[in-house]
A protein has these predicted regions:
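Alpha-helix termini
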Residues: 20-24, 93-101, 142-145
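Short secondary-structure boundary micro-motifs
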Residues: 40, 70-71, 100, 139-142, ...
Length: 182
């Protein structure tokens, strides 16, 4: 096929890294990859091993209201997002956001890992799921001020600064099957 760019999804790149090395790994013209799910701990090794120059990582979900795109080729990031979002402190043991004394969420500092939430606005709506109860369970209210609402993505990301983020981990759902989180 002589392709120079390919797409990837999820753990595909990790599976390739776990495979035994082969002489075929650089016998291609592929210099760019676009997709989602490239783990930061394999990013550089993957590029070196397979001869990839650019990885254009994306972040989005069909039900969500926040997306990122790595159009500037910053290694180890999902890029930046033009939509309103926040990265908040999250207690993994309690499986819940961390709240301040006034009952509001606390944003992480640059370099810290937290829960990615997308602000629900007229221009950035949350279309949600077909199940109204599931919708209620993923909407956080009064996050920073009375009356605001955010979509809980269920994903941990690192705040890189410059409105860039790095995907770290998914909290609950492990994979999608026929368009549904399983």
């Amino acid at each position: 096929f002589d392709a120079s760019a390919i797409g990837y999804v999820g753990e595909l790149c990790r599976y390739l890294m776990d495979a035994s090395p082969s002489a075929l790994e650089k016998g291609h013209r592929v210099t760019k990859m676009i997709g989602n799910g490239m783990r930061p701990n394999i990013w550089d090794k993957f590029k070196q091993r397979f001869g990839i120059e650019e990885i254009l990582e994306l972040y989005a979900s069909s039900e969500g209201n926040v997306g990122f795109s790595n159009v500037f080729n910053f290694d180890n990031t999902v890029g930046f997002s033009p939509t309103p979002y926040a990265i908040i402190q999250f207690d993994k043991e309690k499986n819940a956001p961390v709240y301040d004394a006034k009952g509001g969420c606390i944003k992480v500092k640059k370099g810290e890992v937290g829960l990615l939430i997308g602000k629900i606005t007229r221009r950035s709506p949350f279309d949600g799921y077909t199940d109204p109860e599931k919708n209620k369970s993923v909407i956080l209210k009064d996050v920073f001020k009375s009356g605001d609402a955010y979509f809980n993505t269920g994903d941990l990301v690192r705040d890189i600064g410059f409105r860039h983020a790095q995907f770290v981990d998914r909290l609950g759902d492990t994979f999608r099957w026929k368009g549904e989180n399983v």
